Curated annotation (Swiss-Prot):
Belongs to the universal ribosomal protein uL3 family. This is Large ribosomal subunit protein uL3. The keyword RNA-binding applies. It comes from the Archaea. Part of the 50S ribosomal subunit. Forms a cluster with proteins L14 and L24e. GO terms for molecular function: rRNA binding; structural constituent of ribosome. InterPro entries: L3_arc_euk, Ribosomal_L3_dom_3_arc_sf, Ribosomal_uL3, Ribosomal_uL3_arc, Ribosomal_uL3_CS, Transl_B-barrel_sf. Keywords: Ribonucleoprotein, Ribosomal protein, RNA-binding, rRNA-binding. One of the primary rRNA binding proteins, it binds directly near the 3'-end of the 23S rRNA, where it nucleates assembly of the 50S subunit. The keyword Transmembrane helix does not apply. Gene3D superfamilies: 3.30.1430.10, Ribosomal protein L3, domain 3, Translation factors.
Length: 337
């Protein structure tokens, strides 16, 4: 019997499905955290492997049993705090009130932007913000990555804005001044077992047809045999006499900025423990992990070498933040897999 109801194919929630404006993702919202500290970390996707761990999820069918779990390895060199930015609240949203720049910067940063001039007065910038602290609504920091330390073929750092934890803007500002110009490691931001949101630009698939892009059904019978099987049955009604934007058509697929919520950190390791996760022959299309790394349960968006921003989970209510016991990490070669 024919079905009376069939939902549309594909979601229009992400339309228009076009290429991301830039490869470094911009974090659009931040969780409210009382403890001072950075709310995000950036790393480069090295690849995937699997581990044998004891399932510690309450009420799980495999609770207390050893299970095989796929994991993603991200190489996370330290982030360098290069500036402090304050915002004031206006009728049109947050507006930049003032900035404090680090006087000493790394040489690689010149590949991305011009550092502060030699006569830049940092103390005057700090005093100007402190005198207007009653107008400050939020404080964030601008950080840059250090790709030279990772196994990615680039030297130019990525620059992005990172939120701060703290109860008041004054507390956030004082903490930001403490870390200004310093490196912050992954172990100072996250702990094992914590939940994070993975934000990245997905793999690019290029120009694809509507069957792969939207998941519509292939035409059957004579329509399929006439070499026109992989297209939609109709572009729309006679009236209105225009094609609606909701009609599934061919176009760009992939290379979109996406957020995946509640990814658990299973392990945080330093450079001395890199051999625990490096497979024989290195990760395919990446190489060997040579710096600090983070092991994430499951997958994250993007191909290898892609920058992934890990933000403290914004929807982590009720999540059990306890690291499971890992009994085995597979280091078998991934070549030809």
């Amino acid at each position: 019997m024919a079905r009376h109801h069939q939902p549309r194919k594909g979601s229009v929630a992400f339309s228009p499905r076009k290429r991301a404006a830039r490869e470094t993702p911009r974090v659009k919202s931040w969780p409210q955290v009382d403890e001072p500290g950075l709310l995000a970390l950036a790393g480069y996707k090295a690849g995937m492997t699997h581990v044998m761990m004891v399932d510690n999820q309450k009420n799980s069918p495999t609770e207390g049993m050893e299970v095989s779990t796929p994991v993603t390895i991200l190489e996370v060199p330290p982030l360098t705090v290069m500036a402090v930015r304050t915002y004031e609240k206006t009728s049109r949203g947050l507006k930049t009130l003032g900035e404090v720049l680090a006087t000493e910067t790394k040489d690689d940063l010149r590949r991305k932007l011009t550092p502060p001039a030699d006569d830049y007065d940092q103390e005057a910038a700090i005093e100007k913000i402190r005198s207007n602290m009653e107008y400050v609504a939020d404080v964030r920091v601008i950080v840059h990555t250090n790709p030279r330390l990772a196994s990615v073929p680039k030297k130019k750092p990525e620059v992005f804005e990172c939120g701060l934890g703290g109860k008041t803007p004054e507390e956030k500002f004082e903490y930001a001044l403490e870390i200004l110009g310093k490196d912050v490691r992954a172990s100072e931001i996250f702990s094992e077992g914590a939940f994070v949101d993975a934000i990245a630009v997905t793999k690019g698939k290029g120009f694809q047809g509507p069957v792969k892009r939207w998941g519509i059904r292939i035409q059957y019978g004579k329509a399929a045999r006439s070499s026109k099987g992989r297209h939609i049955g109709s572009l729309g009604p006679w009236t209105p006499s225009r094609t609606m934007w909701t009609v599934p058509q061919a176009g760009q697929m992939g290379y979109h900025r996406r957020t995946e919520y509640n990814k658990q950190i299973l392990k945080i390791g330093d450079a001395s423990e890199a051999d625990l996760v490096n497979p024989d022959g290195g990760f395919v299309r990446y190489g060997l992990v040579r710096n600090d790394y983070v092991m994430i349960k499951g997958s994250v968006p993007g191909p290898t070498k892609r920058l992934v921003v890990l933000r403290k989970a914004i929807r982590a209510a009720g999540k059990q933040e306890e690291a499971p016991q890992i009994n085995y990490i597979s280091t078998a070669s991934k070549q030809g897999v």
